Amino acid sequence: MVSIRPDEISSIIRQQIEQYEQSIKVDNVGTVLQVGDGIARVYGLDKVMASELVEFEDGTVGIALNLEEDNVGVVLMGDGLSIEEGSTVRATGKIASIPVGEAAIGRVVDALMRPIDGKGEIHTTQSRLIESPAPGIVQRKSVCEPLQTGITAIDAMIPIGRGQRELIIGDRQTGKTAVAIDTILNQKGQDVICVYVAIGQKASSVAQVVNVLRERGALDYTIVIAANASDPAALQYLAPYTGATVAEYFMYQGKHTLVVYDDLSKQAQAYRQMSLLLRRPPGREAYPGDVFYLHSRLLERAAKLNDALGGGSMTALPVVETQAGDVSAYIPTNVISITDGQIFLSSDLFNAGLRPAINAGISVSRVGSAAQIKAMKQVAGKLKLELAQFDELQAFAQFASDLDKATQNQLARGQRLREILKQPQYSPIPVEYQVATIYAGTNGYLDDIPVEAVAKFVAGLRDYLRTNKPEYGEIIRTTQKLDEKAEALLKEAIAEYKATFTA
């Protein structure tokens, strides 16, 4: 018979007791009552927070948006095809956050910063909440530095400053995205990090934009965030906030950033879809009551920070699409009232061949000349006045048959000024050469050049200045003023080039 040794048994029991660890994991779980149209109704989840992330059995993630007495309304960030009635849902205890860092530059990602360009994972160590409060009044500084778009009409008449929010508004196919992309291309070498957010667009359109940025070397300082038309409404709703969060990370490091939201009409439509499916009461144009707050909390995050916080900035260019030029619709009026100005693109001007089709009469920048270099201020004031007078005279000239010489001269100059504001797509012009062309136009140097030859003349003049008078560009780049020496060089160049052009 085997002898039982009590000391051995007691040591084994003691060892077992010492190694025993009791860990209780408590999960806040619920049950799916119904699911469909990107919305799930969940029973349970008693301790869930507003906007908390929840996880379904199949791994689909959702956001708890409606916290009601007897159930929770969750919007799905996936197709949710394998979610069934009765399946369990787990609250994660986290609010939506995304990874941020330098590694994201040059990549194409979705609204949750997951790469969609096939170049592998993005390795970052930091993360930020998608929804974070905007900088307060004390943390801000007034907008004082220009953000050059490279588009003469904008930089001269509707200047944009670093930290400003400037709306780009117009009908479909009027060149809104082209203005935004040109602005991104013009930031090359300016130490500005750009974020392009595509909301509800065709995947082919986004691919085209990415190709343009890659071919022109702009992807080296740009992050593209895409929530395509085929993506769930929740991702289209989140994408702009993701863009703001990425830009905010760089802004708080003292860097300058530019964010393009293309376009906020689609985000509002995605939010409307979610709200109606969650049975929230509809308001004007069936949008929910908080659609103003949807955009204001996004655009208020754009700022120019004070020097104590590093002096970084985030400039926002939201895009809004109008229907038949109606800027008094709900979303356009909301965004106009939130932003610091708007660039209005007109389909009539676009069809008449004036591209970019900027309607200078309705467009405005509420920051104004604080966002211009001194050289541009010196020449732009006269341009605005002459174009305004030209628009009035043109309307009057349609009815009058015999016009006096002064009026004819003014109309002729106005036509030439219109020509110098025309610009091909994807070819931004440096500010020093914009100053030169406006100076030539407003001081009558183009009055004897045929209207159809003006575009060729100003393009040639820019090349002539670049090769024969490099000192002119150097003076404006360093002093930012059109001083006597620069003006003398410019006059010389115009006279010399004109002689060869008309010969």
UniProtKB/Swiss-Prot annotation:
Pfam families: ATP-synt_ab, ATP-synt_ab_C, ATP-synt_ab_N. Optimum temperature is 55 degrees Celsius, activity was detected from 4 to 95 degrees Celsius. Its EC number is 7.1.2.2. It is an enzyme of class 7 (translocase). ATP binds at residues 170-177. The record marks 363 as: Required for activity. Its main location: membrane. GO terms for molecular function: ADP binding; ATP binding; proton-transporting ATP synthase activity, rotational mechanism. It is a peripheral membrane protein. Inhibited by dicyclohexylcarbodiimide. Keywords: ATP synthesis, ATP-binding, CF(1), Hydrogen ion transport, Ion transport, Membrane, Nucleotide-binding, Thylakoid, Translocase, Transport. One of its GO terms (cellular component) is plasma membrane-derived thylakoid membrane. It catalyses: ATP + H2O + 4 H(+)(in) = ADP + phosphate + 5 H(+)(out). It is found in: Cellular thylakoid membrane. InterPro entries: ATP_synth_asu-like_sf, ATP_synth_asu_C, ATP_synth_asu_C_sf, ATP_synth_F1_a_nt-bd_dom, ATP_synth_F1_asu, ATPase_a/bsu_AS, ATPase_F1/V1/A1_a/bsu_N, ATPase_F1/V1/A1_a/bsu_N_sf. Signal peptide: none annotated. The keyword Transport applies. The keyword Disulfide bond does not apply. Belongs to the ATPase alpha/beta chains family. Produces ATP from ADP in the presence of a proton gradient across the membrane. The alpha chain is a regulatory subunit. The complex from the organism is particularly stable to disruption and remains functional after 6 hrs at 55 degrees Celsius. F-type ATPases have 2 components, CF(1) - the catalytic core - and CF(0) - the membrane proton channel. CF(1) has five subunits: alpha(3), beta(3), gamma(1), delta(1), epsilon(1). CF(0) has four main subunits: a(1), b(1), b'(1) and c(9-12). This is ATP synthase subunit alpha. It comes from Thermosynechococcus vestitus (strain NIES-2133 / IAM M-273 / BP-1). The lineage of its organism: Bacteria, Bacillati, Cyanobacteriota, Cyanophyceae, Acaryochloridales. The gene is atpA.
